[in-house]
């Protein structure tokens, strides 16, 4: 009888196990690589922070803060929260460690789990995996374009092509107050429910992010921020678009876009993939020029993004593509006997030192069982070593794709395999 554990992963928290975890690693690493090629340094952030950091940084009226955060009191009765996003934590770290007093822009990349209490569904988890970048300290449209192009390059390096970039401008401090008044005037004239009216009073932009069809219909004629930009904000956005054109990054201007976090200003963007249905976003971000000062630091600008690793995997699946190599190893060793096992263990260590992924047949499972294990491993080559091979100082090398087997001198096999595996 098969035994089952009485424990399982919490609802909405996925496990990634072999062979599928190879896809996860490939997607994450490709997105990280795109940022590192642009000079972004790695930052590792705490899993939990002071709750006030997110309340102040993300916005107290946002759904993230009011409905989705995992918040609890620690044993010292301090209120802490599992991080729901990365930008606020990065800004806190930049201020705390004085990175803002060095060379600007500060360019950082990070990855890991983030936590939001949402209704679990495909690609929308309570523990979500993201890759993020932040570029802090320079208000330059070219930097906006660089950040966007990094995300675009990361997706394309995976072979993903069914996505599109949507972007808009949310204005700056010189034009947003007047737009806020216009929007509130419009919203207060609608038959809104009490909760939505409260949102309109606190932060009217949050109402534009309402996903309910009946509210979306009421908002059809709402004034748009992009039609009320200041001259400086308009010029900034036009320069961003010009840089994207020069970089060959395709885009669609979506004047109705509203991101779910309060700190965004000016350039705001999202990558969407229609193969994912209603939950089509695979990543997004924008500029947040007032956030650092709001958190107690210098009045420096910033721009960044968060890309969903889980959702990018679903987008690849929707296109019938795969990014990961499910093979656990390049070479699988099958020793026949104790003397052969001792020699094979040493050979495996030599191959690994040469950068070759190697696994061995352990447990005395017999030749037939060992060869089945070799086949399941996905290895390109299987090494077979017995007493006769030891006596002749050779080893059998089987190409698992063709079935061809040859004898190679033991002293040469590391160089031969390294050369053939590239």
From Swiss-Prot:
Localization annotation: Cytoplasm
Pfam assignment, any one: HGTP_anticodon
Domain of life the protein comes from: Bacteria
Xref: PROSITE patterns: AA_TRNA_LIGASE_II
Catalytic EC class: ligase
GO cellular component: cytoplasm
Quaternary structure and interacting proteins, as annotated: Homodimer.
NCBIfam families named in the record: hisS
Stated family: Belongs to the class-II aminoacyl-tRNA synthetase family.
Name recorded for this polypeptide: Histidine--tRNA ligase
Native species: Nocardia farcinica (strain IFM 10152)
Name of the coding gene: hisS
């Amino acid at each position: 009888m098969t035994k089952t554990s009485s424990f399982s992963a919490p609802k909405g928290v996925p496990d990634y196990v072999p062979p599928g975890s190879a896809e996860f690693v490939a997607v994450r690493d490709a997105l990280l690589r795109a940022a590192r090629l642009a000079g972004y340094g790695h930052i590792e952030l705490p899993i939990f922070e002071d709750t006030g950091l997110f309340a102040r940084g993300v916005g107290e009226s946002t759904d993230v803060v009011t409905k989705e955060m995992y918040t609890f009191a620690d044993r010292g009765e301090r209120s802490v929260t599992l991080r729901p996003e990365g930008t606020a934590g990065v800004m806190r770290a930049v201020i705390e460690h004085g990175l803002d007093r060095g060379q600007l822009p500060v360019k950082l990349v990070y990855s890991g789990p983030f936590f939001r209490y949402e209704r679990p569904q495909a690609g929308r988890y309570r523990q979500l995996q993201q890759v993020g970048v932040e570029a802090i300290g320079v208000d330059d449209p070219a930097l906006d374009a660089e950040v966007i192009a990094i995300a675009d390059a990361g997706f394309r390096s995976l072979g993903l092509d069914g996505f599109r970039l949507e972007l808009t401008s949310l204005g700056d401090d010189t034009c947003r107050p007047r737009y806020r008044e216009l929007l509130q005037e419009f919203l207060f004239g609608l038959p809104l429910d009490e909760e939505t009216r409260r949102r309109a009073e606190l932060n009217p932009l949050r109402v534009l992010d309402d996903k309910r069809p009946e509210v979306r219909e009421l908002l059809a004629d709402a004034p748009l921020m992009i039609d009320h930009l200041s001259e400086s904000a308009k010029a900034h956005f036009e320069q961003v678009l010009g840089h994207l054109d020069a970089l060959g990054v395709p885009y669609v201007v979506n004047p109705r876009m509203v991101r779910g976090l309060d700190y965004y200003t000016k350039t705001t963007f999202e990558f969407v993939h229609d193969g994912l249905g209603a939950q089509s976003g695979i990543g997004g971000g924008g500029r947040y020029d007032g956030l650092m000062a709001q958190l107690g630091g210098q009045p420096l600008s910033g721009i960044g993004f968060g890309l969903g690793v889980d959702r990018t995997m679903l987008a690849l699946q929707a296109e019938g593509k795969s990014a990961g190599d499910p093979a656990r190893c390049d070479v699988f060793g099958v020793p026949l006997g104790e003397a052969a096992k001792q020699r094979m263990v040493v050979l495996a260590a030599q191959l690994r030192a040469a950068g070759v992924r190697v696994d061995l047949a352990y447990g005395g499972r017999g030749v037939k069982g060992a060869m089945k294990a070799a086949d399941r491993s996905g290895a390109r080559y299987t090494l077979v070593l017995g007493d006769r091979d030891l006596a002749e100082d050779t080893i059998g090398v089987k190409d698992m794709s063709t079935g061809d087997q040859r004898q190679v001198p033991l002293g040469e096999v590391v160089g031969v395999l390294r050369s053939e595996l590239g």
